[in-house]
Amino acid sequence: MTKTICQFSCNISAWKIVCNKTLSDSDWALGYTHWQKNSESFPDFVPKLEFLAPLKRRRLSDSARLIFEAAWNLVEEKTNLPVVYASANSEINRNFSLWHALLTEGDLSPTSFSLSVHNALIGQWSELRQVKAETTALVANKDNLEIALLEAYLLLREGEKQVLVVVAESPLALEYNAHPVMRQPFSYALALVVEAGEQYQLSLSNSAFEMEPVLDSALEWVKNQHLNCTQWQTPNSMGGVWTWQKN
């Protein structure tokens, strides 16, 4: 018997996605198979981050640069928003590089190690934006976006007016021949400003996901914005189904 596990609602007042590739609106609407097939042919994009001093820019990894480019102007002067960051991979390429250095050189850079942990990226954001509000870093495998929005909803229920949600992924570099591994077609950072409201209603049920596979729910969300979809489903990491309703 199908059972509702949880349900909640929220508004998304602003959002922006930044990738290391340049996609047109029509590219976004075509979906994951198209992105995967054409990932090598999309033009490269490198954020300039002109709002940061050169010394501060140099400290940021490629993943961090995408996050800053997506979120910086989105929050404008609201520098002290609580942040929920979600990623399955986070700084996975830095981690593999560190493992290689440890095996071949027997030593690690303390700075590189400190920047390899899961919450390092959002820690850099907090430092450079002087965020003193609550920050959360989580990983939920298949449904990072949904769980991040649920965490934001709980913060709103505690009295916050807005929450910055950031979902970011960078695929493992091809030079690391690891199996099994799911590689996204490109690196991306999706930033959303979340508020209380009924614009989006999400419901998690224990039914099996029987539709065409959704390999990244954040990218699926972006695709559905370009298609003006009002209802869709995404898989939950524990085997359930998220049903989205956009009002």
Model-derived regions: residue spans:
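Conserved "HGTGT" condensation-loop signature of ketosynthase/thiolase-family condensing enzymes
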Residues: 1-137, 168-247
